[in-house]
Amino acid sequence: DLHCQVRVGGYGGAQGLAQYIREQRIDLLLDATHPYAAQISQNAALAAGLSGVLCWALRRPAWVAQTGDDWREVADWAHLVQALKPFHRPLFTLGREPLAHRDEIPESQFWTLRALDHYPGNERCDVIGARGPFLIDEERALFEQRRIDVLISKNSGSSATEPKLE
């Protein structure tokens, strides 16, 4: 629990956030956004500069592969598609990004996409709208029920989302 006022989102970019900082006479901005929310962090730093306040960034450590883990890192979507060729039932936990590729799914694959909100799937993919954190038993059940053979995720750290790695 934080012993201060907490406000979440909806500022209208860096300019809107800077205006809010000035109006509320805020003297310290704490950026505790998701590790891959680069635009929000950029706006926070810019707004802090525009309004003359300090901006502290809270960053959580990335996950670290353990003995026996089979992690593969890819540079971009094209490399990911190549890396997925031997797999048949991937689970994507990348948010909305894979939605743009629903019509590119190879015949040999069926994708499960998990995002915060539900979106339409198609004959080659299901989209699950769900917000974590998820319990390890829930994750294991999802993998078993859907016969998931590979997980695609960004390394965002956090013990709250780590059960999907187990």
State each model region's role.
Residues 27-28, 89, 149-150:
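Structural motif
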Residues 124-166:
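A C-terminal functional module that forms or caps the active site or interfaces directly
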Residues 78-111:
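Internal active-site segments that recognize and position negatively charged phosphoryl groups
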Residues 102-133:
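Histidine/lysine/aspartate-rich catalytic loop segments that bind and position anionic ligands
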Residues 1-10, 69, 121-126:
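N-terminal beta-loop-helix "entrance" segment that forms/cooperates
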Residues 17-78:
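Glycine/small-residue-rich loop that forms an oxyanion/phosphate-binding "nest" at active or ligand-binding sites
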Residues 1, 58-64, 77, 96-99, ...:
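Short, polar loop motifs at secondary-structure junctions
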Residues 4-21, 128-138:
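Glycine-rich, highly charged phosphate/nucleotide-binding loops
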